[in-house]
C-alpha cells in the first residue's frame, strides 16, 4: 500500500466510491457528472491536503485521507475509503502514516476528527489509533434534508490526539 498526494488522474476511481456515499458527511461530495469528477479531482490535486491511498502502488485508488490546517499547530483530519476494501486494515495503516506525516513533517501538536454517531467503523478506527473521545455535539451539523426539506442534524463525536500521546504509543 502506498500514500501519495492526490493526482488528477485518480478521479475515475475516486468518483466510483463517491457516486454513492455511505456516510452523510460525504453526501455533499456526491459526484453525478464526469465534469464534476474532473473539477473536484483537480481541486484535490492542487495542494497536499488530500492524500491518495493506493493498493500495492499499482495506481489502484482505494481511498483518501485529508487534513485541514488550523493555526498555529492543529489539524482536522478525515478519511474516506471504497467500501470494497473495508475491514482489511488499510484505513488504519494509512491513517498511521498520515499521523506520522503531520506530527513529524508538519509539526502538528494536535489532531482531531469529527465522526458521526452512527459511523461505527470510523469511531473504532479513531480508538485504535489512540485518539480520545472528547465529547459529543448533539445535532451539530446537517448534511442532508428529510423528505420535507427539513435539515436532518447529526450527532457528532470529536476525537483528538496530542503529539506527546502519539509519541508514547510509538515506544
What is each stretch, according to the model?
Residues 1-21, 54-171:
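Acyl-donor (CoA/ACP) binding surface of acyl/acetyltransferases
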Residues 14-15, 26-29, 44-48, 75-79:
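Short charge-dense sequence patches
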Residues 22-42:
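Conserved GNAT-fold acetyl-CoA-binding loop/helix
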Residues 23-24, 47-50, 108:
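A general structural signal for well-ordered secondary-structure junctions
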Residues 25, 38, 49, 57-60:
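Short linear motifs in intrinsically disordered/low-complexity regions
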Residues 31, 42-45, 130, 145:
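Generic secondary-structure transition motif, activating predominantly at the C-termini of alpha-helices
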Residues 33-36, 45-47, 82-84:
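Juxtamembrane/interface motifs at transmembrane-helix termini
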Residues 41-53, 63:
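A short helix-loop-beta-strand connector motif used in the catalytic cores of GNAT acetyltransferases and
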Amino acid at each position: 500500500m502506498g500514500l501519495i498526494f492526490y493526482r488528477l488522474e485518480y478521479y475515475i476511481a475516486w468518483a466510483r466510491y463517491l457516486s454513492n456515499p455511505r456516510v452523510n458527511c460525504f453526501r455533499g461530495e456526491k459526484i453525478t457528472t464526469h465534469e464534476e469528477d474532473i473539477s473536484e479531482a483537480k481541486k484535490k490535486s492542487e495542494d497536499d491536503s488530500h492524500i491518495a491511498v493506493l493498493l500495492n502502488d499499482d495506481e489502484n485508488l482505494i481511498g483518501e485521507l485529508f487534513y485541514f490546517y488550523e493555526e498555529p499547530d492543529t489539524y482536522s483530519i478525515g478519511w474516506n475509503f471504497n467500501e470494497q476494501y473495508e475491514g482489511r486494515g488499510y484505513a488504519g495503516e494509512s491513517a498511521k502514516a498520515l499521523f506520522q506525516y503531520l506530527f513529524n513533517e508538519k509539526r502538528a501538536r494536535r489532531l482531531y476528527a469529527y465522526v458521526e454517531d452512527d459511523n461505527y467503523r470510523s469511531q473504532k478506527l479513531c480508538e485504535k489509533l489512540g485518539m480520545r473521545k472528547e465529547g459529543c455535539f448533539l445535532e451539530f451539523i446537517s448534511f442532508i434534508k428529510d423528505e420535507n426539506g427539513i435539515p436532518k442534524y447529526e450527532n457528532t463525536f470529536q476525537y483528538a490526539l496530542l503529539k506527546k500521546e502519539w509519541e508514547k504509543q510509538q515506544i
